[in-house]
Amino acid sequence: MSAKILAIDTATENCSVALLVNDQVISRSEVAPRDHTKKVLPMVDEVLKEAGLTLQDLDALAFGRGPGSFTGVRIGIGIAQGLAFGAELPMIGVSTLAAMAQASYRLHGATDVAVAIDARMSEVYWARYSRQENGEWIGVDEECVIPPARLAEEAQADSKTWTTAGTGWSAYQEELAGLPFNTADSEVLYPDSQDIVILAKQELEKGNTVPVEESSPVYLRDNVTWKKLPGRE
């Protein structure tokens, strides 16, 4: 399936846009924490112009649904909804944590990734993912927001070496050093739309899209317990 998907993400300090067309990705990104509203629409125009497409030519519009900065997540979904509504496109929300796992695979071939984004207030947004042979990512832990010291206390021992991604690892290096499994740094700090668009294609192929009015953010602030998902090794 040769899908044409535009992805937008402003959930963290990184502002990014990516366009998937003919299985090729055209992307723009810039770490600009306070300029997302200024940067994102020009990026959209650039990638569409480079591909010779308009919004009406696309099959879907994807967005980083969170977790991340409350303001950043709201900006991204608001802009994505506006574009999708005008072009009558279905939408696909993609986890920013899962996108960082995909980035670790893209850059380093990592297949077991532990993602921790600095959530401020002495907490991290946390999840672990394992990549399957079909390219899909399976969550090992339920996405949550949790104090890193508590995470280190509650996490179960594991024989795998987990590739780390996210700003939480440097922000809470001492606390997370207590985790009962080995880690290797991927140097992936932020989610990026070029990875969101790949995960969005998987969802599109499964028919997992929603209309504009049903697209929603994921903040995680009400999900504060670490939980290993059932049946996941």
From Swiss-Prot:
Keywords: Cytoplasm, tRNA processing. One of its GO terms (cellular component) is cytosol. GO terms for biological process: tRNA threonylcarbamoyladenosine modification. Gene3D superfamilies: 3.30.420.40. It holds the Pfam family TsaD. InterPro entries: ATPase_NBD, Gcp-like_dom, T6A_TsaB. CDD domains: ASKHA_NBD_TsaB. NCBIfam families: T6A_YeaZ (TIGR03725). Structural analysis identified two distinctly different modes of TsaB dimer formation. In one form, prevalent in the absence of nucleotide, the putative nucleotide-binding site is incomplete and lacks a binding pocket for a nucleotide base. In the second form, an interface between the two subunits apparently completes a nucleotide-binding site. This analysis suggests that the two dimer architectures observed in the crystal structures correspond to a free and a nucleotide-bound form of TsaB. This is tRNA threonylcarbamoyladenosine biosynthesis protein TsaB. It comes from Vibrio parahaemolyticus serotype O3:K6 (strain RIMD 2210633). The lineage of its organism: Bacteria, Pseudomonadati, Pseudomonadota, Gammaproteobacteria, Vibrionales.
